[in-house]
């Protein structure tokens, strides 16, 4: 980045091209570079919220991938989703244009900052947003690069005025190990991305490196309610680790006196830091989002705030300012006094957490939970097939669509229909149904929704687009 800064200063501005710029991770980095004064452009297969947002900022966007898109570029940035058969990658290789991985570019942005990297199988995006809110409330105004749209800002990335940078660290291909962070957060570790890691032990070892690569003056924040994280922390002695949890009495930071309602959670916090005498209690912290998993995400942010001495007022004010993250239990529509929720859950553990929250709310409203799930990636479904069969207990009615491939080839025997067939055969759910088309969800909602119901539309594919179009569809029915 120093060389790029020199070239920028000397008025020899070079173009950085992002292949797949509409991806949530890529768009954030592109936006930060643009805001720093670099010349940025990019391409994607289709327009989406992110490409339109970047275009409004003056960033040139190409729809479709062709060699002509990189005619006058000096650097090409790719994510792990872009392979070498991409025509723009082929052109870059042919012309010997440097190809930079997304994680490498993120690392360069973080290198000269005091950086907080948030990783884990689930909860990264919300935790990143919560940490950012606490930094803002403490007057530190960080640069933020997130994996989801932060409702406070209507963007997934923004440039701050301080020397702090907070980033979501994607563990999917082990590149998060190379991120030069000062503070590392691990929310949980579950068997995920095994198409890359091949086995769970390799994934766990990557998280170990994520902590041990910290500088000696840095620290990690880890949730020891999670068995695998606890085992990992117990075997790390060379770096400072702050632990948190709800069920773990031995955690440094714990939540108790928990109460929840439909839109928020309130709890007290007990703080007992290593090498610090005495116990501190923070009473009545409120977060404007429901769910036990979000209390855990909040404890991660509190752990950072306590260690950096933000103060109780800043911590409470930070949470009060939090407005949530797009596609994290987001209400998008209402039909027959039933709420339609759009949620990113696509892993069995995420599905359990989302449905548990929905069940708690539905019970208070004397309603039921209707789950409509779109599986994401054949490889994920293959690796976690048994877990997917067992994760829908809190749904009163279950509907599963076919798999959103996300560019993957079909795997024999892996489909939405096969998942439903096995759920029924093994009696994991007695109200499970297959939806041949996502459009059939509209009929399900119209026929099944009752007052007080929670209709949860889950997945990392295009089910979100469908969910967000429902208000218009309902309007057309009236």
From Swiss-Prot:
GO biological process, one term: peptidoglycan biosynthetic process
Transmembrane annotation, as ranges: none
Recorded superkingdom: Bacteria
Cellular component, GO, one term: cytoplasm
Pathway of action: Cell wall biogenesis; peptidoglycan biosynthesis
Pfam families (alphabetical): Mur_ligase (PF01225), Mur_ligase_C (PF02875), Mur_ligase_M (PF08245)
GO MF terms, alphabetically ordered: ATP binding; UDP-N-acetylmuramate-L-alanine ligase activity
Cited function: Cell wall formation.
Catalytic activity: UDP-N-acetyl-alpha-D-muramate + L-alanine + ATP = UDP-N-acetyl-alpha-D-muramoyl-L-alanine + ADP + phosphate + H(+)
Protein name: UDP-N-acetylmuramate--L-alanine ligase
Places the protein is found: Cytoplasm
Top-rank EC class of the record's enzyme: ligase
Organism (species): Rickettsia bellii (strain OSU 85-389)
Positions annotated to bind ATP: 120-126
Keyword list, A-Z: ATP-binding, Cell cycle, Cell division, Cell shape, Cell wall biogenesis/degradation, Cytoplasm, Ligase, Nucleotide-binding, Peptidoglycan synthesis
Enzyme Commission identifier(s): 6.3.2.8
Family designation: Belongs to the MurCDEF family.
């Amino acid at each position: 980045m120093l060389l790029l800064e020199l070239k920028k200063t000397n008025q020899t501005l070079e173009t950085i091209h992002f292949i797949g710029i509409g991806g949530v991770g890529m768009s954030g980095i592109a936006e930060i570079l643009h805001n720093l004064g670099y010349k940025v452009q990019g391409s994607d297969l289709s327009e989406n919220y992110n490409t339109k947002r970047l275009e409004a900022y003056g960033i040139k966007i190409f729809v479709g991938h062709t060699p002509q898109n990189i005619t006058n570029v000096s650097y090409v940035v790719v994510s792990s989703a872009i392979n070498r058969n991409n025509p723009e990658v082929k052109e870059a290789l042919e012309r010997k244009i440097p190809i930079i991985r997304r994680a490498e570019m993120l690392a360069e942005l973080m290198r000269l900052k005091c950086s907080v990297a948030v990783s884990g199988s689930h909860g990264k995006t919300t935790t990143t947003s919560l940490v950012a809110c606490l930094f803002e409330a403490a007057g530190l105004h960080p640069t933020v690069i997130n994996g989801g749209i932060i409702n406070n800002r209507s963007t997934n990335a923004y440039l701050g005025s301080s020397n702090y940078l907070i980033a979501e660290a994607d563990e999917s291909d082990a590149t998060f190990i190379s991120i030069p962070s000062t503070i590392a957060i691990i929310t949980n570790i579950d068997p995920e991305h095994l198409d890359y890691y091949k086995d769970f032990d390799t994934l766990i070892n990557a998280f170990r490196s994520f902590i041990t690569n910290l500088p000696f003056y840095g620290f990690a924040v880890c949730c020891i309610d999670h068995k695998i994280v606890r085992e990992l922390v117990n075997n790390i002695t060379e770096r400072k680790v702050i632990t948190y949890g709800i069920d773990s009495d031995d955690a440094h930071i714990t939540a108790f006196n928990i109460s929840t309602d439909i839109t928020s959670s309130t709890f007290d916090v007990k703080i007992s830091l290593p090498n610090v005498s005495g116990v501190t209690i923070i009473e009545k912290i409120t977060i404007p989002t429901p769910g036990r998993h979000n209390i855990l995400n909040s404890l991660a942010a509190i752990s950072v705030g306590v260690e950096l001495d933000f103060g109780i007022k800043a911590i409470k004010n930070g949470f009060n300012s939090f407005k949530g993250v797009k596609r994290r239990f987001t209400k998008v529509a209402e039909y027959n006094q039933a709420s339609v929720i759009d949620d990113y859950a696509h892993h069995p553990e995420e599905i359990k957490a989302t449905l548990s929250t929905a069940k708690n709310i539905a019970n208070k409203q004397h309603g039921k939970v209707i789950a409509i799930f779109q599986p994401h990636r054949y490889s994920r479904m293959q690796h976690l097939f048994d877990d997917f069969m067992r994760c829908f207990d809190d749904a009163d009615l279950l509907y599963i669509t076919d798999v959103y491939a996300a560019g993957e080839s079909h795997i024999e025997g892996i489909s939405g229909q096969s998942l439903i067939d096995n759920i029924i055969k093994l009696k994991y759910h007695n109200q499970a149904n297959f939806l041949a088309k996502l459009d059939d969800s509209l009929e399900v909602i119209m026929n099944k929704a009752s007052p007080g119901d929670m209709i949860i539309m889950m997945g990392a594919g295009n089910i979100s687009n469908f969910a967000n179009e429902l208000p218009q569809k309902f309007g057309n029915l009236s």
